[in-house]
């Protein structure tokens, strides 16, 4: 089809660390011409389609594309091919968390909050919250590389395209486990939806780290403020296996 996009300003290059961890890192390199595979754009981030197909038909939700092994030609904005917006009622808290120092948050004895923050990357980080505050990646090469790296580490696909698909389906599974309807998650802003699920996990874990005899972290306080104004129906079944001070493995 003539309206399939093959042009790429930059291309992602995946590399794997030589140590036992085999951690994937993604760097974008200048390209500036037609690629041999279709190239989709998410908020300006180039995604070569070696394992999925490109769709030029607008749809309400990203999962509808992914279930057909497609990615939209361009999305992440209101005018993109994922029409419906991602949920926005945690936006203020997400922005506030993005400004916190993760080292400061982790020095408190809050093992359940720490575990909640360790999904889906397996280690506690505020990266997803930071990505959620960005309008796009066209002018932010470092953040684009970092976001693509995290997607590939979570999704563990052969390329950036199927890694994104596997990452999004990991999000859908987490919602299913928590008995939370997924219809509100459209995939227009993937980072924000991951942060949304992390906040649900935070609010579920919150009560297990409450102590009357000790101060709490700034992260805990922000989550507690959000919890106080959030309908408990949004938390689903509130499934959680509590950690204690004697058992803090995450």
Curated annotation (Swiss-Prot):
InterPro entries: NSs-like, RVFV_non-structural. It comes from the Viruses. Pfam families: NSs. Belongs to the phlebovirus NS-S protein family. This is Non-structural protein NS-S. The gene is NSS.
């Amino acid at each position: 089809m003539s309206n399939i996009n093959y042009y790429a300003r930059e291309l992602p290059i995946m590399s794997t660390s030589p140590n036992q961890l085999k951690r994937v890192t993604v760097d974008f390199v200048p390209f500036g011409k037609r690629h041999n595979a279709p190239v989709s754009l998410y908020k300006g981030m180039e995604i070569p389609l070696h394992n999925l197909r490109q769709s030029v038909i607008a749809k309400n939700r990203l999962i509808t594309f992914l279930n057909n092994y497609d990615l939209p030609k361009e999305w992440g904005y209101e005018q993109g091919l994922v029409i419906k917006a991602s949920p926005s009622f945690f936006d203020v808290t997400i922005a506030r968390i993005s400004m916190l120092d993760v080292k400061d948050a982790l020095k408190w004895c809050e093992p359940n909050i720490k575990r909640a923050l360790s999904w889906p990357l397996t280690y506690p980080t505020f990266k997803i919250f930071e990505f959620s505050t960005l309008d796009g990646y066209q002018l932010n090469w470092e953040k684009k590389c970092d976001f693509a790296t995290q997607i590939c580490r979570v999704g563990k696909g052969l390329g950036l395209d199927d890694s994104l698909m596997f990452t999004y389906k990991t999000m859908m599974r987490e919602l299913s486990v928590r008995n939370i309807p997924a219809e509100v998650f459209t995939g227009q802003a993937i980072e924000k939806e991951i942060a949304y699920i992390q906040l649900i996990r935070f609010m579920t874990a919150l009560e297990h780290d409450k102590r009357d005899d000790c101060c709490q972290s700034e992260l805990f306080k922000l989550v507690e403020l959000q919890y106080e104004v959030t309908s408990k129906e949004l938390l689903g079944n509130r499934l959680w296996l509590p950690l204690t001070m004697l058992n803090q493995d995450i």
